[in-house]
Amino acid sequence: CLQWGVFLLPILPIFGSISIFLGMILSYRHQFKSIRKNPVNQGLAILSILLVIISILANNSLESFLGLFNFIPYFIMFAGLSEIIQTPSQLRQLSWLMIFGAIPVIILGLGQQYLSWSGIDILQGILGWSLQLNGNPVGRMSSVFMYANILAAYLIIIFTLTLGLLIEEWQNKAENNDGYILNKNQKITLLIITLLLTAIDLILTNSRNAWGLAVLSSLAYALYLGWWWLILLVTTGVTAVLGSAFAPSPIKDGLRMIIPAYFWQRITDENFVRPVETLRITQWKFALNLAQTRPLTGWGLRNFTPLYEAKMNVWLGHPHNLFLMMFAEIGIPTALFFMVIICWILSQGFLLLTNSLTNPSERLVYYSYLITFLGLILFNCFDVSLFDFRVNTLSWIILSGIWGVVDNTIGNSTKNSYN
């Protein structure tokens, strides 16, 4: 069920979510005792209670209770799925399924931008999406997602996992028994094509955030593998692009003859005149002010938007920073408690990578999940992706896999110590 759900989620989110839900239910049915005793799940249960209390005390309780659906169902899903995703081999299979599921998204995005594809509105109730002509905002690829930045967050997941699988297949002389009919060369070819098309789509989302994260994920693999030549190459390229945007005039002018204007114009934002109310720095200051005004309980989930609109006369769905949003909406103590849980999971993941995983192929697959989730964290420093059901679901599945492998390893070590 879970595998079908992961595959179908991007293009058929309703059917994908049902499959994932059924997989989660089966996990609870067979592993409820283990789920209940897991310390991370206990922490998430406490966090859920705190969020309910905060919603009762919120400035707008109705909005805050609606906001619970962006958190508590995913805590429940995490607890169930981390009991059934427990090996690097399973992570590899899920990576392949995410990549196969992304291919239609990538193709539809290219059609949207270059072939003026649009519509399918009549099937929106079944598909859960429609294709907007020339993207949203116009000129920025959004494919099957509501907005270009959400597509960018999704593509960062696909780009990072695809790059990890490509490196693994390239290095691995033996065939992986992953259950697919493709041979090694066919898999490498498919991964290269998918990676290139994903990179093109990332560029066409016009998301500076995603561009930077694609570079950082590439550097993360290069550092892990000790590929200093690639680090030098990427660093040189990034320096040239940034120089074309911000270097002093003689240097900048020369670099702009080499670097396409598409990049440095977007980085400098010089083609856009933005009202002060729409600037990220303005939103961040407002969110900080909200956090300082009600530091203990916050203003309630989804309360940033009406408060900002009342003050600035501009509607914004979020302050373009997940952490500042949480400080403002659920209070500093609860937000920090949430962050501690996530940091604990990731720290245990890196300890597992360092101390317990010995198979190079398994280490690389697990590492790809760690840096994918870290990439999502960095993405949410300049945007907020949790309001999109599909990206949020994939994010929690990735975290479930990270913790599931840790929990399984700890369990096996405990059993061995008693034998």
Language-model features, listed with the residues they occupy:
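Transmembrane signal-anchor hairpin modules in multi-pass inner-membrane enzymes, especially those
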Residues: 1-66, 76, 86-92, 96-99, ...
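Juxtamembrane membrane-water interface segments that cap and precede transmembrane helices
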Residues: 2, 130-144, 278, 314-325
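Short, aromatic-rich membrane-interface segments at the entry and exit
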Residues: 12-22, 63-69, 209-211, 228-234, ...
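Alpha-helical transmembrane segments of multi-pass inner-membrane proteins
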Residues: 20-23, 49-52, 76, 92-137, ...
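Transmembrane alpha-helices of multi-pass inner-membrane enzymes
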Residues: 22-27, 215, 367-419
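A membrane-periplasm/extracellular boundary helix in multi-pass inner-membrane enzymes
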Residues: 107, 113-116, 204-205, 222-271, ...
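Long extracytoplasmic/lumenal interhelical loops at the membrane interface
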Residues: 270-330
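Hydrophobic transmembrane alpha-helices and their immediate junctions
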Residues: 330-377
